[in-house]
Structures are given as structure tokens and as C-alpha cells.
């Protein structure tokens, strides 16, 4: 529980921190520059759970193979916002249920949006 409290209160690094880990070819941009591209919205869930030894693990999935830019990539469960989703948290929960059949989830917090240029998604 102590770690959850720390996660809830930790300062987010924001867009600046994301570019520290981005490929060198991805130039830093501002939220305003990203918004000019009219990105589509999506959400993912970083799902943490204890293993049999009570060590913290998290879920990754492998995307299906198709002719898109994210074919067969390793990812968090998630996907595009749907008109019936009330917000991005609802999107992440719905997509997680669809992809890995997990329904009993306690959300801790949202993180800074991440822009994915190849598919023009804000996640």
C-alpha cells in the first residue's frame, strides 16, 4: 500500500521526460504541435499483479499481425476510444477486458499522454 501512495503522489515527468527515451529521429515537439495533427485517442492499461512469490509483475500483449505500423508489436492491453466510452479510463478497462478477459481492476492514476507519430495516436 505504501508504494501505491507513492505512485499516486509522484510528480509526472510529462512530455519532456518522454523524449529522453524516444528514438533520436523523433524530434521533441510541444502539445500544441501534436494537436495540429488532430491525433486519434486511445488508452492502455499498465496492469500490475503479484506472482506466486508475491513479486510484482505486469501484463504485456503481442498485437496481431496485419498491414499496419503496429503489427506484431509488444504492447500494454488497450486501444482506440469508442463513442460509448465515457473517458479514457473506460477505454483502457474495456479494451483490457476484450483483450485479456480481466475485469477486476483498481485504477491507481492516469499518466501523461504519449504521442505515437507513426499512427498519429495520443495514448
Question: How would you name each of these model-derived features?
Answer:
Residues 1-75, 80-123:
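N-terminal leader/linker segments that precede catalytic domains of diphosphate-processing enzymes
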Amino acid at each position: 500500500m505504501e508504494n501505491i501512495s507513492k505512485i499516486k503522489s509522484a510528480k509526472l515527468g510529462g512530455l519532456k521526460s518522454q523524449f529522453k527515451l524516444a528514438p533520436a529521429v523523433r524530434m521533441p515537439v510541444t502539445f500544441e504541435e501534436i494537436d495540429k495533427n488532430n491525433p486519434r485517442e486511445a488508452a492502455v492499461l499498465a496492469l500490475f499483479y503479484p506472482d506466486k512469490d508475491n513479486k510484482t509483475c505486469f501484463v504485456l500483449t503481442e498485437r496481431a499481425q496485419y498491414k499496419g505500423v503496429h503489427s506484431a508489436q509488444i504492447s500494454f492491453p488497450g486501444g482506440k476510444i469508442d463513442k460509448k466510452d465515457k473517458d479514457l479510463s473506460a477505454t483502457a478497462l474495456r479494451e483490457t477486458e476484450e483483450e485479456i478477459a480481466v475485469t477486476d481492476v483498481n485504477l491507481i492514476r492516469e499518466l501523461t499522454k504519449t504521442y505515437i507519430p507513426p499512427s498519429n495516436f495520443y495514448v
